[in-house]
Amino acid sequence: MSVGSYYKSSAGGGMVTIQSSSADLQAFQDFAKVVPKAAAAAHRRAINKTLGWLRTHIARAVSRQERIAVAAVRQRLRSYPVTGGAMSGKLWFGLNAIESSRIGRARQTGSGVSVAGRRYQGAFLKQVYGNKPDIWIRTASKHFDADDYPDSTVSSGRGPSSGWVAENGSRFPLAKAKVSLEQARPHFESWVGKADERLLQLLQQELNFELQKYLRS
C-alpha cells in the first residue's frame, strides 16, 4: 500500500520520493479501468510536473534562507522523473557544504573577500587548484574561523582533500571557504507535505485533460 510521498535523509543529502497515496489513486480507479493507458500517462505527467515544481520551490527557499544564488542551489538538486511503468519519481538534494565562490559573485577587497553578503576577512580569491578561483585563507591567519570553512580536514598528501590544502611551503596550509547546507535538512518533511498536495492537484488536472480527450474521441 502506498503511503504517498516521503523522504529519506543521509549524511550527504536527502532523497524525496514523489508518489500518490493509495487513497488518492482509489478516487480515480474507475477512470483507470476504462482507459488505463490514459490514466497512466496522466499519473506520470502529474508526478514529473510535481518534481519540477518541488525543485523550483526548494531552490528558492534555500536560496533565500542561506543567501545563496538560486543557480548554485539548483546544481545540488537532481530529478529522477517517472519512466516506463514506474509509479514514483525522485528528487535528490545534496547537502554537503558548497564552495563560497559558487554562491554569488565573489569580489576581492583590501581586507578579504566578499560574496553574497558574506565577508571573509583575511581571505583571498585565487585559482589554486582546478580551473576556477576559490576563496582561501591561510590557517595560520588570525582571521581564520573554522565555522567559515566547514567540512575541512587536513590532508597529508599533495593537493586538496575536503577543503584543506596541506603542502610544503610558506603559503600552506590553506582552507577553502564553504557554506554549510545542514540548516536546510529540517525542511524536507514540510516540502514532502506540500508536494503531496501539489501532486493531487496536478493529478486531477491531468486526469481531467485525459477525460476530455476520451469524451471527444
Language-model regions: role of each:
Residues 2-217:
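Short, Lys/Arg-rich flexible segments
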